Amino acid sequence: RNHSSAASDVYKRQGKMKTPMEIWEDEEHLTKGINKILTGTFFKKKPLHDITDSDMRSMLRRYSGTQMVSNFRPTAAAALYDIFVDKDSPLEGTTAGTVWDPSMGYGGRLLGAIAAGVNYIGTDPCIPTYKGLEQIRDKYGHKHKSYTLLRQGSETYDPKEESLDFVFTSPPYFGWEAYGDEPEQSSIKFNTSDLWKEKFLKQTIANAYKGLKKGKKLALNVANTKQYKTFEEDTVQLALDVGFEHTDTWWLSLSTQQGGSTTTTLEGDSVDKKQENRYLGKFERPNLSGRKFEPTFIFTK
């Protein structure tokens, strides 16, 4: 069976780790991964003719030494919209607020906005994902709500003053995630960390400050990486410099390692899973064994 469509939807991640696409294009690794499905090692055993696109995507994501770019959970986005944004309610006399998502990505926050019943403005320069986001909007969006999708970088979006009720996003990680090769991509347009921080990240935060109504919130989901060790600290400081007040930090649970302290790799080896907190930075994670957390910083105008 031809599973090329499963691979074509997997984007690349920068760094030393292999990307799912690289596993797909490597005959040795791809064969080894498929054999693990056929033999039931690490995956549910399936005969060749029963292997689905979903099985292939799962294998490519979980292959040893592989990482991929991720999508923000729509349920988590909807929860934040429910808390921070008004909805249409004749009983309470409120109307649906408007949110801006500076980096739309793969549509997790758009789906969350649709589920929460709020108006949505999103910006992102990536052409393929923009087309997919239009399909999400057209298929799942509500006719009585507004969903404005703009194919541009967030640093160039100039909102009307005090027109936004909430700004929420997970910005691209400089030197870690590559979502496309468009010249408007922030890591291409601003190709050094200092330039990216000043011209992209700070400008995006400044645009959010301009657009937000007084007392409303900006929420940014970021995390330090090996390539950008102070992403969290820099993000908070830039928001303070723009004029925001850092009023809270919420923790997003990314994954849970069930069972004991060992796991089996696709190569059939048993390895120890170290679950201790090895985070180095200012914002300490909750100390819950087996869980990985990222901060969502909450700022108030």
Enumerate the predicted regions with their spans.
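S-adenosyl-L-methionine
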Residues: 134-159
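Mobile active-site "lid"/loop adjacent to the S-adenosyl-L-methionine
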Residues: 164-204, 226
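Class I S-adenosyl-L-methionine
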Residues: 226-236, 244-301
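Conserved proline-anchored active-site loop of SAM-dependent methyltransferases
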Residues: 77-79, 98-113, 122-124, 152-155, ...
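Conserved alpha-helix/loop element of class I SAM-dependent methyltransferases that forms part
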Residues: 71-94
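Conserved Class I SAM-dependent methyltransferase catalytic core
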Residues: 194-255
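Single conserved hydrophobic/aromatic residue that forms the stacking wall/gate
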Residues: 2-7, 11
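Short alpha-helix immediately C-terminal to the canonical SAM-binding loop
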Residues: 128-133
